[in-house]
């Protein structure tokens, strides 16, 4: 877990300390197996307008995360903190061996302070012919929640999507979400996708009974 602080010079110096991190995230059992993608962000490099590439070990490089909420800054531990307005996060990327149809998608968000707007979370799938499918998650889950000493909450949120096979020959994806106001510190994000397996693997997948979910707890320091 990251403990972070940042000084904001406005009317005076304000110290923001966040005790955040993934606590009890929703981790798919199929992460790291064939026909899956995983991306994780824990140390951001751009607070506003720049691409943040996945930095967690075993992430692929097929996506980037950008904050379009002006006024945000990086904290000492590489969180994205917004002292003046909401965060507006857009994540976008491509598919391995595109076009590919995802079957399951799992998103985890860790933040402290002003909470993430759970109604703002959407996933879009695009093909090369201008078609677009934008859907809300089928499940939005508060995996961890406790009061934050400076106001607001410390939360780990999870969102899931399920898709029918051959819904769209997707070559690109995009995930959007925002916070409900100023003073949000975005600590970590993860995204998992499971795709239609290769024909030779379908019988094996059927024998195994498909995928499932497990949950873990990140050690708090």
Give names to the regions the model predicted:
Residues 14-20:
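Sec/Tat signal peptide C-region and signal peptidase I cleavage site
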Residues 117-130:
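Short, surface-exposed beta-strand/strand-loop-strand elements in extracellular ectodomains
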Residues 99-114:
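A short beta-strand element within beta-rich, extracytoplasmic domains
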Residues 174-183:
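Short beta-strand-plus-loop segments that form exposed binding edges in beta-rich domains
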Residues 130-163:
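Extracellular carbohydrate recognition and processing domains
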Residues 198-216:
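A short, hydrophobic C-terminal helix/tail in secreted or cell-surface proteins
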Residues 21-83:
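N-terminal targeting leaders for non-cytosolic proteins
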Residues 76-101:
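Short beta-strands within extracellular/lumenal beta-sheet-rich domains
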């Amino acid at each position: 877990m990251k403990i972070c602080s940042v000084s904001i010079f406005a009317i005076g110096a304000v110290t923001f300390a966040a005790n955040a991190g993934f606590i009890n995230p929703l981790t798919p059992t199929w992460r790291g197996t064939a026909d899956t993608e995983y991306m994780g962000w824990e140390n951001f490099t751009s607070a506003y307008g720049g691409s943040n590439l996945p930095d967690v070990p075993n992430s692929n490089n097929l996506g980037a995360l950008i904050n379009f909420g002006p006024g945000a800054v990086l904290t000492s531990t590489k969180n994205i903190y917004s002292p003046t307005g909401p965060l507006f996060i857009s994540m976008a990327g491509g598919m391995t061996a595109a076009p590919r149809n995802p079957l399951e998608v799992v998103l985890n968000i860790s933040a402290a302070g002003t909470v993430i707007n759970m109604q703002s979370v959407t996933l879009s799938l695009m093909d090369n012919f201008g078609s677009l499918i934008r859907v809300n998650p089928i499940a939005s889950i508060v995996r961890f929640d406790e009061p934050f000493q400076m106001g607001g909450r410390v939360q780990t949120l999870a969102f899931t999507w399920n898709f029918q096979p051959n819904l769209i020959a997707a070559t690109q994806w995009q995930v959007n979400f925002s916070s409900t106001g100023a003073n949000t510190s975005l600590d970590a994000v993860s995204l998992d996708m499971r795709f239609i397996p290769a024909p030779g693997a379908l019988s094996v997948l059927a024998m195994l009974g498909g995928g499932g979910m497990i949950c873990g707890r990140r050690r708090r320091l």
